[in-house]
A protein has these predicted regions:
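Conserved RecA-like ASCE P-loop NTPase motor core of nucleic-acid helicases/translocases
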Residues: 2-10
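A short beta-strand element within the Helicase C-terminal
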Residues: 91-104, 128-131
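SF2 helicase motor core recognition
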Residues: 68-71, 82-96, 115-123
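Conserved nucleotide-binding/hydrolysis micro-motifs of P-loop NTPases
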Residues: 11-13, 38-40, 87-89, 105-108, ...
Length: 181
């Protein structure tokens, strides 16, 4: 089944996205939130079920176990994972191949980290990265302009071998452009 991970920078926006998805027909169990606080009811229930299922198998510490529980639930149940940047590190989501950046961070490495959650060893499909941009919003346009300039700098120093660079510049994934060559 198709899985999608959506990244945003704030918990408020995370909750807004979840509410909008529910309005379109997604059920509560289809949508999973990850923000590093592990304080909502659903996350606590998922963690308790994971503990029962994995009793005696692992003792990584609470934070790591919560991450394992979230990833396990996403892999087997939920269709959409909505993360703050707390989810841009330490999650292995190679079973998911669609990354949506709802808002763009100032730091291009954060975009790399977000995409890297899915674009990793074991991924069986091309990873599609979608960067949303509100062109009517001056702040969003400014962030995009700054990111574009930073990616141009990286291109000059490291070469244009970056998935995020291709996705950000033209909306076409880097792999797709290579296949067209």
């Amino acid at each position: 089944p198709q899985k999608v991970v959506i990244f945003t920078e704030s918990k408020r926006t995370q909750k807004y996205i979840a509410a909008e998805l529910r309005k379109t027909g997604f059920e509560d169990e289809d949508i999973l939130l990850f923000n590093g606080d592990f304080d909502d009811t659903m996350t606590k229930e998922i963690y308790k079920a994971w503990q029962v299922k994995n009793f005696g198998k692992a003792n990584y510490g609470r934070s790591v176990e919560y991450k394992h529980a979230i990833v396990d639930y996403f892999r087997n149940n939920a269709k959409i994972l909505i993360c703050t940047d707390a989810g841009s590190e330490g999650l292995n989501l190679q079973f998911c191949n669609t990354v949506i950046n709802y808002d763009l961070p100032w730091n291009p490495m954060k975009i790399e980290q977000r995409i890297g959650r899915c674009h990793r060893y074991g991924q069986e499909h091309d990873v599609v990265a979608i960067n949303l941009l509100n062109t009517d919003n001056e702040a969003d346009r400014r962030v995009y302009d700054i990111l574009s300039k930073k990616f141009e700098l990286f291109e000059g120093v490291f070469g244009a071998s970056d998935v995020a660079l291709g996705a950000l510049e033209s909306g076409v994934s880097f792999e797709k452009r290579i296949l067209d060559i």
